[in-house]
Protein backbone atom coordinates (compact mmCIF):
# COMPACT_ATOMS: atom_id res chain seq x y z
CA UNK A 1 0.00 0.00 0.00
CA UNK A 2 1.34 3.47 -0.86
CA UNK A 3 1.90 6.18 1.77
CA UNK A 4 -1.11 8.07 0.41
CA UNK A 5 -3.41 5.03 0.64
CA UNK A 6 -2.09 4.23 4.12
CA UNK A 7 -2.93 7.75 5.23
CA UNK A 8 -6.37 7.39 3.63
CA UNK A 9 -7.06 4.26 5.67
CA UNK A 10 -5.64 5.63 8.91
CA UNK A 11 -7.72 8.80 8.68
CA UNK A 12 -10.97 6.90 8.14
CA UNK A 13 -10.79 3.95 10.55
CA UNK A 14 -13.38 5.50 12.87
CA UNK A 15 -15.43 7.34 10.27
CA UNK A 16 -17.49 6.40 7.21
CA UNK A 17 -16.21 7.02 3.74
CA UNK A 18 -17.94 10.00 2.18
CA UNK A 19 -18.18 11.24 -1.38
CA UNK A 20 -15.30 13.40 -2.45
CA UNK A 21 -16.07 17.13 -2.47
CA UNK A 22 -12.93 18.93 -3.69
CA UNK A 23 -12.69 22.66 -3.14
CA UNK A 24 -14.10 24.45 -6.20
CA UNK A 25 -11.15 26.84 -6.36
CA UNK A 26 -8.54 24.07 -6.74
CA UNK A 27 -8.10 23.12 -10.39
CA UNK A 28 -5.65 20.27 -9.91
CA UNK A 29 -5.58 17.92 -6.88
CA UNK A 30 -2.37 17.38 -4.97
CA UNK A 31 -0.32 14.26 -5.81
CA UNK A 32 -2.15 11.17 -4.55
CA UNK A 33 -5.28 13.13 -3.64
CA UNK A 34 -7.18 12.11 -6.77
CA UNK A 35 -6.65 8.41 -5.93
CA UNK A 36 -8.25 8.97 -2.54
CA UNK A 37 -11.14 10.88 -4.11
CA UNK A 38 -11.76 8.02 -6.56
CA UNK A 39 -11.89 5.46 -3.74
CA UNK A 40 -14.14 7.68 -1.63
CA UNK A 41 -16.53 8.25 -4.52
CA UNK A 42 -16.64 4.55 -5.40
CA UNK A 43 -17.44 3.67 -1.78
CA UNK A 44 -20.18 6.32 -1.65
CA UNK A 45 -21.74 5.04 -4.90
CA UNK A 46 -21.82 1.52 -3.46
CA UNK A 47 -24.10 2.82 -0.71
CA UNK A 48 -26.87 3.53 -3.20
CA UNK A 49 -29.72 1.01 -3.73
CA UNK A 50 -28.97 -1.50 -6.47
CA UNK A 51 -25.35 -0.39 -6.74
CA UNK A 52 -23.85 -3.88 -6.79
CA UNK A 53 -22.14 -3.20 -10.10
CA UNK A 54 -20.61 0.19 -10.90
CA UNK A 55 -19.01 0.94 -14.25
CA UNK A 56 -15.98 3.15 -14.71
CA UNK A 57 -18.14 5.35 -16.95
CA UNK A 58 -20.59 5.95 -14.10
CA UNK A 59 -17.76 6.56 -11.64
CA UNK A 60 -16.11 9.06 -13.99
CA UNK A 61 -19.42 10.84 -14.56
CA UNK A 62 -20.03 11.06 -10.81
CA UNK A 63 -16.66 12.77 -10.41
CA UNK A 64 -17.04 14.91 -13.55
CA UNK A 65 -13.83 13.55 -15.01
CA UNK A 66 -13.01 11.30 -17.97
CA UNK A 67 -12.51 7.55 -17.79
CA UNK A 68 -8.99 8.18 -19.03
CA UNK A 69 -8.40 10.26 -15.90
CA UNK A 70 -9.42 7.28 -13.76
CA UNK A 71 -6.94 5.04 -15.51
CA UNK A 72 -4.14 7.51 -14.92
CA UNK A 73 -4.45 6.62 -11.23
CA UNK A 74 -5.58 2.97 -11.38
CA UNK A 75 -4.59 0.39 -13.97
CA UNK A 76 -8.02 -1.25 -13.74
CA UNK A 77 -11.29 -1.21 -11.83
CA UNK A 78 -10.04 -4.29 -9.97
CA UNK A 79 -7.20 -2.17 -8.63
CA UNK A 80 -9.74 0.34 -7.33
CA UNK A 81 -11.53 -2.42 -5.45
CA UNK A 82 -8.20 -3.62 -4.12
CA UNK A 83 -7.77 -0.15 -2.62
CA UNK A 84 -11.10 -0.52 -0.80
CA UNK A 85 -10.21 -4.04 0.34
CA UNK A 86 -6.91 -2.79 1.73
CA UNK A 87 -8.83 -0.17 3.71
CA UNK A 88 -11.17 -2.86 5.09
CA UNK A 89 -8.30 -5.15 6.02
CA UNK A 90 -6.13 -2.49 7.63
CA UNK A 91 -9.04 -1.03 9.60
CA UNK A 92 -10.53 -4.28 10.91
CA UNK A 93 -7.27 -6.13 11.55
CA UNK A 94 -5.76 -3.23 13.50
CA UNK A 95 -8.91 -2.85 15.61
CA UNK A 96 -8.97 -6.59 16.30
CA UNK A 97 -5.41 -6.38 17.62
CA UNK A 98 -6.48 -3.50 19.88
CA UNK A 99 -9.23 -5.71 21.31
CA UNK A 100 -7.14 -8.84 21.81
CA UNK A 101 -3.97 -6.98 22.77
CA UNK A 102 -1.83 -8.95 20.32
CA UNK A 103 -1.87 -10.58 16.87
CA UNK A 104 -2.54 -13.99 18.46
CA UNK A 105 -4.92 -13.72 21.46
CA UNK A 106 -3.51 -14.94 24.77
CA UNK A 107 -5.06 -18.30 25.80
CA UNK A 108 -4.32 -17.64 29.50
CA UNK A 109 -7.84 -16.42 30.29
CA UNK A 110 -11.12 -17.75 31.61
CA UNK A 111 -13.92 -19.00 29.39
CA UNK A 112 -16.03 -15.93 30.08
CA UNK A 113 -13.13 -13.59 29.34
CA UNK A 114 -12.61 -15.35 26.03
CA UNK A 115 -16.28 -15.12 25.13
CA UNK A 116 -16.37 -11.41 26.01
CA UNK A 117 -13.29 -10.80 23.87
CA UNK A 118 -14.79 -12.66 20.90
CA UNK A 119 -18.03 -10.71 21.27
CA UNK A 120 -16.11 -7.43 21.14
CA UNK A 121 -14.49 -8.52 17.88
CA UNK A 122 -17.90 -9.37 16.38
CA UNK A 123 -19.32 -6.03 17.52
CA UNK A 124 -16.34 -4.18 16.05
CA UNK A 125 -16.77 -5.74 12.60
CA UNK A 126 -20.52 -5.02 12.60
CA UNK A 127 -19.94 -1.43 13.72
CA UNK A 128 -17.38 -0.99 10.96
CA UNK A 129 -19.93 -2.20 8.41
CA UNK A 130 -22.63 0.05 9.83
CA UNK A 131 -20.37 3.10 9.53
CA UNK A 132 -19.19 2.16 6.04
CA UNK A 133 -22.23 0.73 4.19
CA UNK A 134 -20.56 0.78 0.78
CA UNK A 135 -17.77 -1.39 2.13
CA UNK A 136 -20.30 -4.06 3.13
CA UNK A 137 -21.07 -4.72 -0.54
CA UNK A 138 -17.34 -5.31 -1.04
CA UNK A 139 -17.00 -7.46 2.08
CA UNK A 140 -19.87 -9.72 1.00
CA UNK A 141 -18.60 -9.90 -2.57
CA UNK A 142 -21.75 -8.36 -4.09
CA UNK A 143 -19.74 -5.58 -5.71
CA UNK A 144 -17.10 -8.03 -6.92
CA UNK A 145 -19.29 -10.44 -8.90
CA UNK A 146 -18.00 -9.39 -12.33
CA UNK A 147 -14.47 -8.58 -11.18
CA UNK A 148 -11.31 -10.67 -11.02
CA UNK A 149 -11.92 -13.84 -8.92
CA UNK A 150 -8.88 -13.03 -6.79
CA UNK A 151 -10.86 -10.20 -5.18
CA UNK A 152 -13.57 -12.62 -4.03
CA UNK A 153 -10.86 -14.94 -2.74
CA UNK A 154 -9.27 -12.12 -0.81
CA UNK A 155 -12.53 -11.27 0.95
CA UNK A 156 -13.05 -14.95 1.73
CA UNK A 157 -9.61 -14.96 3.33
CA UNK A 158 -10.62 -11.85 5.28
CA UNK A 159 -13.56 -13.65 6.90
CA UNK A 160 -11.45 -16.76 7.49
CA UNK A 161 -8.95 -14.63 9.37
CA UNK A 162 -11.73 -13.09 11.49
CA UNK A 163 -13.03 -16.58 12.34
CA UNK A 164 -9.51 -17.66 13.28
CA UNK A 165 -9.26 -14.65 15.60
CA UNK A 166 -12.59 -15.60 17.22
CA UNK A 167 -11.44 -19.19 17.64
CA UNK A 168 -8.22 -18.04 19.29
CA UNK A 169 -10.16 -15.73 21.61
CA UNK A 170 -12.33 -18.64 22.70
CA UNK A 171 -9.46 -21.00 23.42
CA UNK A 172 -8.46 -21.00 27.08
CA UNK A 173 -5.49 -22.23 29.06
CA UNK A 174 -5.44 -25.93 30.05
CA UNK A 175 -7.45 -26.42 33.23
CA UNK A 176 -9.29 -23.11 32.86
CA UNK A 177 -12.34 -24.82 31.38
CA UNK A 178 -14.34 -27.66 32.91
CA UNK A 179 -15.46 -28.85 29.47
CA UNK A 180 -14.11 -32.20 28.30
CA UNK A 181 -13.81 -30.82 24.75
CA UNK A 182 -12.60 -27.18 25.02
CA UNK A 183 -11.12 -27.10 21.50
CA UNK A 184 -14.32 -28.42 19.95
CA UNK A 185 -16.33 -25.91 21.98
CA UNK A 186 -14.14 -23.03 20.74
CA UNK A 187 -14.55 -24.17 17.14
CA UNK A 188 -18.34 -24.42 17.46
CA UNK A 189 -18.69 -21.06 19.21
CA UNK A 190 -16.51 -19.29 16.63
CA UNK A 191 -18.51 -20.86 13.79
CA UNK A 192 -21.81 -19.72 15.31
CA UNK A 193 -20.51 -16.19 15.88
CA UNK A 194 -19.17 -16.02 12.34
CA UNK A 195 -22.49 -17.14 10.87
CA UNK A 196 -24.26 -14.48 12.93
CA UNK A 197 -21.78 -11.79 11.83
CA UNK A 198 -22.09 -12.58 8.12
CA UNK A 199 -25.87 -12.94 8.40
CA UNK A 200 -26.18 -9.50 9.97
CA UNK A 201 -24.06 -7.93 7.21
CA UNK A 202 -26.13 -9.69 4.53
CA UNK A 203 -29.40 -8.47 6.06
CA UNK A 204 -27.96 -4.94 6.21
CA UNK A 205 -27.09 -5.00 2.50
CA UNK A 206 -30.31 -6.74 1.38
CA UNK A 207 -32.42 -4.14 3.19
CA UNK A 208 -30.56 -1.33 1.37
CA UNK A 209 -28.92 -0.53 4.70
CA UNK A 210 -32.14 0.01 6.65
CA UNK A 211 -31.77 -2.95 9.06
CA UNK A 212 -28.72 -2.03 11.10
CA UNK A 213 -26.29 -4.88 11.85
CA UNK A 214 -25.96 -3.76 15.47
CA UNK A 215 -29.71 -3.97 16.12
CA UNK A 216 -30.24 -5.56 19.58
CA UNK A 217 -26.65 -6.74 19.37
CA UNK A 218 -25.98 -7.03 23.10
CA UNK A 219 -29.09 -9.16 23.64
CA UNK A 220 -28.21 -11.46 20.73
CA UNK A 221 -24.63 -11.96 21.90
CA UNK A 222 -25.84 -12.57 25.44
CA UNK A 223 -28.11 -15.38 24.24
CA UNK A 224 -25.24 -16.97 22.32
CA UNK A 225 -23.00 -16.85 25.39
CA UNK A 226 -24.96 -19.61 27.14
Model-predicted regions and their roles:
Residues 31, 81, 85, 89, ...:
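Amphipathic, non-transmembrane alpha-helical scaffold segments
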Residues 55, 137-139, 179, 205, ...:
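Short, hydrophobic secondary-structure boundary micro-motifs
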Residues 1-22, 127, 131, 164-172, ...:
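C-terminal peripheral helix-coil segments that are non-catalytic and often amphipathic
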Residues 129-150, 202:
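Amphipathic alpha-helical segments used for helix-helix packing
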Residues 27-34:
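Short, Lys/Arg-enriched anionic-surface-contact patches
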Residues 37, 41, 45-79, 83:
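Helix-turn-helix
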Residues 83, 97-131, 186-193:
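Hydrophobic alpha-helical connector segments
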Residues 93-97, 149-176, 184-191, 214-222:
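Amphipathic alpha-helical packing segments from all-alpha helical-bundle domains
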Amino acid sequence: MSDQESSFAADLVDAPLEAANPAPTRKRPKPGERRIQILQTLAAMLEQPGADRITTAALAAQMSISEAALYRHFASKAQMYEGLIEFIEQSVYSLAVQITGRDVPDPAKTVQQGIAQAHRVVAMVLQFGERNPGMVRVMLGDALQSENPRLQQRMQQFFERIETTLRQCLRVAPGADTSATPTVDANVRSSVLMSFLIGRLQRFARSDFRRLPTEQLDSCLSLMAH
